[in-house]
């Protein structure tokens, strides 16, 4: 090796004519290997020796690669799964490509059809708009009422007398009485004042027309769109009854009743026994007789109804108070109160000595356990948490 060069490598004992050659040598594997040998205090080797060692190492690695371990079942399963996944990916890609091609073809074929459809729709819309312009914009109240009535008559549902008014499945019965019995037991449909009812069939027809024709609830006058909607409302709200509380509600169905028979007792009481003893009475005296009528026949407040017989009929809203059987208050004397207090002592539970002893034992064991725990916890000196302020570190 000549020593005339300016640039040298002490690890490989080489000289270079330029700095570029020196930099290229410093990046080579041969230089790195000689540096490691220098650290291990070994002499440097030549490039031929380094090349032979590299080729020998490559041959040994290839031999070791050939001598692999035997493939296990787990490894085989993993490889099979990987192969299946790759196949699935390929199939999905093929299917996606086919789908895109079909979509493109369908779009190309349907473009003229879409234009035709759009033209047809525009023509239909124009035809619909033309008759709308011809119709009158404003209608009077009478015309509107007539139109609504005609629509209701078209949508009318006739409910026969033998059919239930509230069942959605349209249950039929043999006669009206059986139908009314079913509605009373199943839905609570009760006809008030049946004693004075004259036209039962007319009342049922009126209720059926109110539900079937008007689609109106018989209690709250809720109006539904269809018969089914009204029936569902009445079943849900328990409005399957004839309202008979206010004066307007009674007047609504008054044409089906006749209460003239209820005044028979009053007329019989006022008629004289002997018709021969009639006397002419002036108008002033007749008016005074009317004023002397007992108040029981005329008095009727919002809570109780006073009948001519003297019976008082209560309102249904106060039914729970009428059902109460309250005993009258009895004021006891001092001696009677003392006797009652003495009698009630017998209802006290008897003194159980064994039960008291058992309770005392339980309390004793609880106190003993608590003392033992306190004693054990006091033995540990380092039982308090340590606090270290981080700012003072």
UniProtKB/Swiss-Prot annotation:
The keyword Cytoplasm applies. Its main location: cytoplasm. One of its GO terms (cellular component) is cytoplasm. A zinc finger (C2H2-type) spans 7-31, 162-187, 215-239. Residues 55-82, 102-145, 268-293 are annotated as: Disordered. Residues 273-293 have a biased composition (Acidic residues). Residues 102-113 have a biased composition (Polar residues). One of its GO terms (molecular function) is sequence-specific DNA binding. Keywords: Cytoplasm, Metal-binding, Phosphoprotein, Repeat, Ribosome biogenesis, Zinc, Zinc-finger. It is found in: Cytoplasm. Pfam families: zf-C2H2_2. Residues 64-82, 123-136 have a biased composition (Basic and acidic residues). One of its GO terms (biological process) is mitotic cell cycle. PROSITE patterns: ZINC_FINGER_C2H2_1. Belongs to the REI1 family. Present with 830 molecules/cell in log phase SD medium. Associates with nascent pre-60S particles that have not yet entered the translating pool, and is released from mature 60S subunits. Interacts with pre-60S factors ARX1 and RPL24. Interacts with JJJ1. Pre-60S-associated factor involved in the cytoplasmic maturation of the 60S subunit. Involved in the dissociation and recycling of other late pre-60S factors like ARX1, TIF6 and ALB1 before newly synthesized large ribosomal subunits enter translation. Cooperates with the co-chaperone JJJ1 in the release of the nuclear-export factor ARX1. May act redundantly with REH1 to directly promote a stabilizing structural rearrangement in cytoplasmic 60S subunit maturation independent on ARX1 recycling. This is Cytoplasmic 60S subunit biogenesis factor REI1. It comes from Saccharomyces cerevisiae (strain ATCC 204508 / S288c). The gene is REI1.
């Amino acid at each position: 090796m000549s020593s005339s060069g300016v640039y040298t490598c002490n690890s490989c004992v080489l000289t270079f004519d330029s700095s570029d050659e020196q930099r290229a040598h410093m990046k080579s594997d041969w230089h790195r290997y000689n540096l490691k040998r220098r650290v291990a205090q070994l002499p440097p080797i030549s490039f031929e020796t380094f090349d032979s060692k590299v080729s020998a190492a490559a041959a040994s690695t290839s031999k070791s690669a050939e001598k692999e371990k035997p493939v296990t079942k787990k490894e085989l399963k993993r490889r099979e799964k990987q192969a299946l996944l790759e196949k699935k990916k390929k199939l999905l890609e093929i299917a996606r490509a086919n789908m895109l091609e079909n979509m493109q073809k369908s779009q190309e074929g349907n473009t003229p059809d879409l234009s035709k459809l759009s033209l047809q729709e525009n023509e239909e819309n124009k035809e619909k708009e033309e008759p709308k312009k011809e119709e009158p914009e404003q209608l009077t109240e009478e015309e509107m009422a007539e139109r609504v009535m005609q629509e209701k008559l078209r949508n009318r549902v006739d409910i026969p007398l033998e059919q239930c008014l509230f069942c959605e499945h349209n249950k039929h019965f043999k006669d009206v009485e059986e139908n009314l019995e079913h509605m009373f037991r199943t839905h609570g449909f009760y006809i008030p004042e049946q004693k004075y009812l004259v036209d039962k069939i007319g009342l049922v027809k009126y209720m059926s027309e109110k539900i079937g024709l008007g689609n109106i609830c018989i209690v709250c006058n809720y109006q539904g769109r269809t018969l089914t909607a009204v029936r569902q409302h009445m079943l849900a709200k328990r409005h399957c009854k004839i309202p008979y509380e206010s004066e307007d509600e009674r007047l609504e169905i008054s044409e089906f009743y006749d209460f003239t028979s209820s005044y028979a007792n009053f007329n019989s009481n006022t008629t004289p026994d002997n018709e021969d003893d009639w006397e002419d009475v002036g108008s002033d005296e007749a008016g005074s007789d009317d004023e002397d009528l007992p108040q029981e026949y005329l008095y009727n407040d919002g809570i109780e109804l006073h009948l001519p017989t003297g019976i008082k009929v209560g309102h249904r809203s106060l039914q729970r108070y009428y059902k109460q059987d309250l005993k009258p208050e009895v004021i006891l004397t001092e001696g009677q109160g003392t006797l009652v207090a003495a009698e009630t002592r017998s209802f006290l539970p008897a003194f159980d000595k064994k039960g008291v002893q058992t309770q005392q034992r339980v309390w004793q064991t609880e106190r003993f356990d608590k003392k033992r725990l306190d004693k054990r916890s006091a033995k540990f000196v380092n039982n308090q948490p340590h606090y270290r302020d981080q700012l003072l570190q």
